Design a protein with these regions (language model features):
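A generic structural signal for alpha->beta connector loops
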Residues: 1, 63, 145-147
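Short, conserved catalytic or adaptor-binding loops enriched in Gly and charged residues
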Residues: 1-3, 85-87, 140-143
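Conserved N-terminal catalytic core of the sugar/cofactor nucleotidyltransferase
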Residues: 1-47, 52-54
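Conserved beta-strand termini and adjacent loop/short-helix elements that scaffold enzyme active sites
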Residues: 5-7, 69, 151-153
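A short acidic, often aromatic-flanked loop/helix-cap motif at beta-alpha or helix-coil junctions
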Residues: 10-15, 75, 101, 157-158
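Short, surface-exposed amphipathic charged segments that create phosphate/polyanion-binding patches used
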Residues: 15-22, 81-85, 164-170
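Conserved core of the sugar-phosphate nucleotidyltransferase
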Residues: 35, 47-120
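Catalytic-core segments of class I nucleotidyltransferases/pyrophosphorylases
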Residues: 40, 56, 91-179
Length: 180
């Protein structure tokens, strides 16, 4: 099933987490109780038409530790956005953080698939080292140690990074072909 995790550090707190590592750590009890073997997490500012079964099959076929959905195009203006370089087998070989927004790159859509046990280990290790950035401290620093692969979002996909892109995305969703 799908679960939406809270964006705030605690019920009475109105401040956001300082980073994805802190957010995941705060929800680790919920994640630990989950009976699912895999975790797929995604940011809420993406509009993507993707077959999750195809993503799961790809992840399994590659024997990947982590699979990240990416898009080839102009990089959105987001903090801690990742851009990738791949080998011929789509394995991530280099991660650049927050590339210039006017460049054409293979950028992360922040849709990430991995085993629950790996996520728990990576988050606990990051917390013990006082790390906050999932992208920099977990993904970028483990490119050589883990089998991290990219899965290209080839269908309709957008990242909302401004009021204008929010408007543009809504206008594009009026086209029935984009909703198939």
């Amino acid at each position: 099933g799908m679960f939406i995790l809270p964006p705030f550090a605690s019920a009475g707190n109105k401040s956001f987490y300082s980073g994805r590592v802190e957010a995941l750590k705060a929800n680790m009890g919920f994640i630990a109780r989950s009976t699912e073997e895999y975790i797929l997490f995604a940011d809420c500012n993406n509009i993507v038409n993707i077959d999750i079964d195809e993503l799961m099959d790809y992840h399994t076929d590659k024997a990947a530790d982590i699979t990240i959905v990416y898009k080839h195009g102009k990089c959105p203006r987001l903090q801690n956005n990742m851009a990738f370089s791949f080998d011929d087998d789509s394995r991530v070989r280099m991660v650049a953080m927050s590339p210039a927004s006017d460049t054409i790159v293979d950028y992360s859509m922040n849709i990430i698939l991995m085993k629950k046990s790996l996520l728990q280990r990576l988050v606990n290790d990051a917390v013990s080292m006082n790390h906050e950035s999932f992208e920099r401290d977990i993904i970028q620093s483990n490119v050589e140690k883990l089998r991290i692969y990219g899965f290209e979002a080839k269908g309709f996909s957008l990242t909302v990074d401004s009021m204008q892109s929010y408007f543009d995305a809504n206008m594009q969703l009026l086209d029935p072909d984009n909703c198939k």
